[in-house]
Amino acid sequence: MSASCTITPSPRTELFGSSSKRPIFPSQICRTRNKCEISRRDFAVRGGIVASGVSVMGTPSSPSAASQSLQGNDRLAYKPEGYNFWEWRGHKIHYVVQGEGLPLVLIHGFGASVFHWRYNILELAKKYKVYALDLLGFGWSDKALIEYDAMVWTDQVTDFMKEIVKEPAVVVGNSLGGFTALTVAVGLPEQVTGVALLNSAGQFAAESRKREEAEETVITKFIVKPVKEMFQRVVLGFLFWQAKQPSRIESVLKSVYINTANVDDYLVQSISKPATDPNAGEVYYRLMTRFLMNQSRYTLDSVLSKMTCPLLLLWGDLDPWVGPAKAEKIKAFYTNSSLVHLQAGHCPHDEVPEAVNIALLDWLSNVVSKPSSPEVMEV
């Protein structure tokens, strides 16, 4: 059975930020673009915010060592040295674990880290055992000089589930982490009991073919093929330098957060500091040229057609990159799903954490714990 509902924050948090009282007017909302997929060019250049997010080593100036509260949610304490580390294929992988109970595994988006779940981990840990890990190449995990593709992170999370979690769990992912969650669920059907997607990356086959045709003339024909690797490195080196500037990161974040109250120094610095890693530039180059330009190899319909567990779609409808049409299409394709509309942008878990936590906890109690008779969520 599929279910759909709309959750919005309280009137105050919907219209005003926790530290700002600027209303969000309809005209602002109308200016957002509702696209069904992330444009690879936009993601590589504008979204390069996060491409430099590869290893946070400094200490943000704003957060204290203790967890703080926002919108009723405790915030995970920032630790410049990280929390826990696990060795995977010779690489150091960073992760956080909090709470007890049914495990939840949180997977961040492109260029982010476990700290993007700062307002979710402790709240969810009041009822569940919550894991959040940094994907290889991002956050506190090693900046491995390997050939990156979607299956690298699928293999990483799959092994993390087997070696660290070791029991049935629900996997939750945002953006790139969402598509990774789907591929992990397909590969581990006996261990993944449910999947929750927050503005997931990924394309349907028809969209992928159409985009490939467009990019054959725009990117491949006129840029990629004629340009030699050295020139690519020069251009991407400049983009990397530009992307890691705090002012640029803040600007891009504000373009995908409708309520920008949570675009604070903590978040900006957690993305800008990673660029200090010696391998950051090379990882950026490999991600831009080898991963982002080959996303069409993996499609949502091919993955969803093999998945068997319940699916929750927590969707920021005002996302300028991945609009609500994508969520509706996924829901129509995969019938064992529930859709929750959120008045937020691309990162609803950080923009409206209270609404996300409530919706996720409700689904976990009503659907995952009772798979034989899922209920329609009402708000």
Regions found by a protein language model. Give the residues of each.
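Active-site glycine-rich loops that stabilize anionic/oxyanionic intermediates
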Residues: G101, G109-A112, S175-L176
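Catalytic active-site module of serine/aspartate enzymes centered on a nucleophile-bearing elbow/loop
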Residues: T335-V379
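Active-site loop/oxyanion-hole signature of alpha/beta-hydrolase fold enzymes
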Residues: P11-R12, R75-G90, V96-Q98, A125-Y128, ...
